[in-house]
Amino acid sequence: MPHVPHDAPHDAPHDVSRDASHDAPPAAALAAQAASILVRRPDRPVLVLQQVAEDGPAFLATWLQAQGVAMDLRCAEAGDTLPADLRDHAALALLGGWWSANDDRAWLRAAETLVRQAVAQVVPTVGHCLGAQLMARALGGTVGASPRPEVGWQRWQVADSATARRWFGAAPPERVFHWHGESFSLPAGAQLLASTAACPHQAFALGPHLAMQFHVELDAAKLQVWAADRSPEYLDLLAQHPDSVHDSMAMWADASAALPAQQALAAHLYTRWLAGCR
């Protein structure tokens, strides 16, 4: 994700509710599949780890609230602390951020400890971008530079497997949203679920746990902030990698169809995630 200043100017958002016909069939199919799965409402809150201010839970928070599921949000940049264990939480979610998973930060190492506890105790865990990289590191994988950075709506290839269909549905959308320059190797025992032309490891599953390099939690408000990025780092990436790094106009133009479809995907996989709660 971009390192967006808190006072960054916002571009006028495109109306993503219009012109959504391109990805409408996958979105409708995923919505129907999600509706057919009984959402488990755990009696304990979901622990959500937010690393930086610009990368909040967005659609994840909206979806949890709509399902009546309590969320315990802890943000590193806000000065929050992490619990020592997961006994008071039914599930774990890790968000993204502009930090590297390899940074020497006590918060990141504590987050990895919680991931290992979650796997050992079968507490279902979902990771987004940096959160997925932390999951990979915690479980024995490595994180390093991606073959090419990815920014914007990218086409992806979903594995032809029962596990991939379980998480992403029988008709996943054509594109998902990315903002990353690093990626992960697969931990031992993990199953690769998706890839892109620029990054072969996009998602993996390990039992009831899912790690994704992309941002299914994106909503229009978050996209508005991210698409306003004019940092030298982003502009350099845009100039050097025009095939895999998109500008703000492309992000908004593609969002008309891609964002509703991705949110249907998110609802589906979040439902599967909570289905693993004990």
Language-model regions: role of each:
Residues G207, V216-A255:
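C-terminal helical/coil "lid" or tail adjacent to the Rossmann-like core of SAM-dependent
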Residues M1-P5, D19, P25-V123, Q240-R278:
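N-terminal beta1-alpha1 cap of cysteine-dependent amidohydrolase-like domains
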Residues Q117-T142:
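Catalytic nucleophile loop
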